[in-house]
Amino acid sequence: MFTIDIDTGGTCTDGFFSRDGEFKTVKVLTTPHDLTVCLADCVKEGAKLFDVSVRDMLAATDVIRYSTTIGVNTLITKTGSKIGLIVSKGFKDSLYADDPKEAEPVFSLVPKEMIDEVHEDIDDRGNIITTLEKEDVLDSMQRLIDMGARAIAVSLRNSHVNPAHERKCKSLIKDQYPNYYLGSLRVFLASEISDQPGDFQRTNTIVVNGYIHDALVKYLYKAEDDLRNNFCAHPLMVAHSYGGVARVAKTRAIDTYSSGPALGVIGAGTLGEMYGFSNVITVDIGGTSLDLGLIRDGVHHYDMNPSITGFPVSVPMITTYSAPIASGSIARLDGSNNLKVGPKSAGARPGPVCFNLGGMEPTVTDADVVLGIIDPDYFLGGRINKDRLTMAIDTIDSFAGGFED
């Protein structure tokens, strides 16, 4: 029987296939236009290595697990959904933070003009002080829709002790906008994501979840259907950032945030134990982000209130650290002729110059090929041919000449 583990990043998708103690690895390019394509490509390449058909392999697969850093990359590159946010009256500028300055990073995901307030109040014990009015909710909703919101996040004060007003918002919106609700417009409640105290952290959590939702969830069900259509009898299991896996139906977008690096920490801990190492640093270099993990005395650590690219949230995660520098990061010269690398990444398309998919700007991968750090005869199955190597060298030479100007 087979086990299949696949990780999709912003540039490459990697597969680990095992059968009866034998394992093989695969690397293919991520397909940002449709992530189910690179998932299928990875499975096809894995089947080839075992000299079986895709259907025969999937029919004999006990478990297929999937992890991704797409959520991380979406936040780093600020390419998520346009969302609207509804908060309690008086908290539009602070988002419940003690110091309004703490809320500034959140406005990069949901600008102030996409935030609306409703007049309601629930005290710290869950008692309703001011009742939420229907007209107030629908007026806010309509304004946000008119502003182009593709998803609505609702985070009201003290909803962790009494979510009644948040649930009322969702019910009113569903009744008033059934086509939006069931179709292109989604409604997320902070109380459904977290029941932990801390209105600011819950607000950040629901904003991040709504922001990265479309980049992930829209294709997870399609991926599972594609696998089933090829005789896979078991559900697709999606990796979560706390270290476990769950079915697609039980997965929220924020659960997948940094799930690839998180499971990498668990895997590194297992290898460390096998070789007698109890203190391990893990390094996961992707195409858009670099992620670090730490194992001390054989134990990986959890953060119950982690920070996601500067946003304190209230969902448990294995502790990892992300930086916007990786193999696809683009090098450039600033106004003072200083070398800068990242955070912009070439991704899988147009990709680094050496991929010959339209990329024209030098990346870390191009530099690695020129320096001999990456073997073009091995990387990506040898698809970096001599012509592509020459292109990378010419681009790096041209770029380096800028230092002499």
List where the protein language model places each region.
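N-terminally biased helix-coil "hinge/interface" segments that flank
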Residues: M1-D405
